[in-house]
Every structure is written in structure tokens, then in C-alpha cells.
Amino acid sequence: MTTLKNDRFLRALLREPVDTTPIWMMRQAGRYLPEYRETRSKAGDFLSLCKNTEFACEVTLQPLRRYDLDAAILFSDILTIPDALGLGLYFETGEGPKFHKTVRTEQDVANLPKLNAKADLDYVMNAVSTIRSALGGQVPLIGFSGSPWTLATYMVEGGSSKEFRFTKQMMYAQPEVLHALLDHLADSVIDYLNAQIDAGAQAIQIFDSWGGALAHREYVEFSLNYMNKIIAGLQREKDGRRIPVIVFTKGGGQWLEPMITTGADALGLDWTTPLNTARNVVSGRVALQGNLDPAVLYGSAASIEKAVKAMLDDAYANGEKTGYVANLGHGITQWVDPAQPKIFVDTVHEYSAKYLG
């Protein structure tokens, strides 16, 4: 196995000493990069890009050629699981992901097949192993999945939603049906993430993108409990190293205390939760990741530097010298000038030295 040349990302997640703050960016391989757009045009469409091992590897590596990032993340989509369960994923221009089938009844849930990730999502595993090999130990590779709650919203609604009408209707009128769906999805995610780890993923992130749409009790019952189940079912060591797990609930800053109980090594934050507040809440029990507003990257070099320095000041305000990974508070947007993320990345590495040196 190739020796990892830069492991500060993994070390920070495990609250071990680091020489500088590690950084990666959610959606770092994406439409803001001209080379990504060129590769996507060769693939023909987004799904073809995900399913072609060579293209998926290429776009995963593209941001690492531009920026001094401390981790790569698998290029894929959170909706690969529902697609493999037979719902028929497709994308409509300007409308995002959609499914040919929905899951809205007890019978719909009963009809879902058991996922065999290594067979049903072999293109993802091929991409993971190919990317891991291509990285050559440069930086660790992050694998990922959507949370059961987040996946369920797409499956019940039939695509993206702002109100989650049908999912919340199921939650309050037929909670047993939703629980059955979430349990099926939790088992699927466990299988999927363990297959990614076997293929070479060195850390895992669970994207609970829509957890913040829930009230507190419902968040615990319908989202958090199933992430607990997933983390308990994951391989936590491979090739003699721990596999760190990050849980990211967008809009979940008020739930840090219960989120610690998941067994995750780190919690992701969006930009609505001050890092110094979050540090005080978690009190060194888990690492934190985040949380620059992606819109900051629309600004000038000076304004980006100012915002990044303020974020780092907050992250290290309580005197802790590790347990922190810099990131955006959500995915980078397609309208960002590719020159701006370099300012973000370089400022993190340079400025954090005053705290970690």
C-alpha cells in the first residue's frame, strides 16, 4: 500500500497534532472549473460522467492540480443508491435530479430490493480504486453517502423539494412506513460505504443535506438515529489506520450535542454556526469541519483573506491546536472565479501557522 505523503486531514479529524490546518472544499470538483466543464461535455451528461471511471477519476483530480488541498473527495452523487434501488434517476436542465418512480406506500417500501453495493454500484467502486491509485499517496481520498433522511426525501418527493410535502406527510401520518424506508436505506448506506472503504476510501462523510428541515425531536427520531446505526455498522479501520467519519447536517448547528452521540469523529458546520461557539459545545470530544460561506468566494482577495482569518481566529479561540478542518459551509457554487479558491486555501495554510507553529 502506498504511503500517505500528506495525512494532516486524517490527523486533524482524529484530533492529533498537525503542522497547519488541513483544507478541502465541498464540491471542489465542479462546474466552476473550466476543465470540469470540458470533461463533462465529453461525457455527454452528468450521470455518464459519474459512471465513467476514467472521467470520474479525472474530475476528482482536477482541483488538486490547481489548489494545495489536503484531501480528495470521490466524484459521484448522493442519489446513486436510490438509482440502484430501481427508482430511475435522471436530470432535467434547470430542475435538478428527478426519479421515474417514487416511494410513498408500505408496498413501495416492501418492493425495494436489497442493495449489493459492490455489484449494483460497481462503477462507484471502480472509481474509488482508480482514484486511490492515481493519487499515489498524495492526499487521502474521502468516500461519501447521503444520509437516510436526505435520500428518503428525494425518493418520496420524486426529486428536489423545498417543502418536503409528501415526506413530512408520511412522517406524521404514517411514521411506521417512513421508519421502514429509513431502516432499509441505513442498511444500504452501510453496505455502500463499507464497499467504498474496501475499494480504498480513507475517510467517510455522511451528507445530511436536509436534516435542517426537521424539528428537534423529528431530527433525532428520523435522521440522527439512522446515522447512529450507519456509523455503528461501518468498518472503522483499514490497513492499520482508523477510518474517520464526518457527519454534516446542513442547518444542524443547534444539534451538536446530540450529534456527538453518533460516534462520528468530526461534525461539519454550515456558516450559520460560529466556530468558537461550536468548539465550546463539543469541548474536544469531536473534531469540527467548516464553515466559510461559499458566497465569500465572490469577493475580492482582501475580503476573502479577511473572512478566512476571522474563521480561523474563531476555530482556535479556545486554545485547541488540532481537531479542525477548514472547509466551506456548503458546496462551492458554479459562478465562482477559479482564482478565488486559491486565496482561500493558501490563506488557511499560511495564517493557521500562527496558531499551530
Curated annotation (Swiss-Prot):
Kinase among keywords: no
One example GO MF annotation: uroporphyrinogen decarboxylase activity
Annotated site residues (Transition state stabilizer) in this chain: D77
Pathway involvement of the protein, from the record: Porphyrin-containing compound metabolism; protoporphyrin-IX biosynthesis; coproporphyrinogen-III from 5-aminolevulinate: step 4/4
Catalytic activity, reaction form: uroporphyrinogen III + 4 H(+) = coproporphyrinogen III + 4 CO2
PROSITE patterns assigned: UROD_1 (PS00906), UROD_2 (PS00907)
InterPro entries linked to this entry: UROD/MetE-like_sf, Uroporphyrinogen_deCO2ase_HemE, Uroporphyrinogen_deCOase
Origin: domain of life: Bacteria
Binding site for substrate: R27, Q28, A29, G30, R31, D77, Y154, S209, H330
E.C. numbers: 4.1.1.37
Broad enzyme group: lyase
NCBIfam families reported in the protein's UniProt record: hemE (TIGR01464)
Job description of the protein: Catalyzes the decarboxylation of four acetate groups of uroporphyrinogen-III to yield coproporphyrinogen-III.
Assembly description: Homodimer.
Name listed for the protein in its UniProt record: Uroporphyrinogen decarboxylase
Organism for this UniProt entry: Acinetobacter baumannii (strain SDF)
UniProt lineage: Bacteria, Pseudomonadati, Pseudomonadota, Gammaproteobacteria, Moraxellales
Gene that this polypeptide is encoded by: hemE
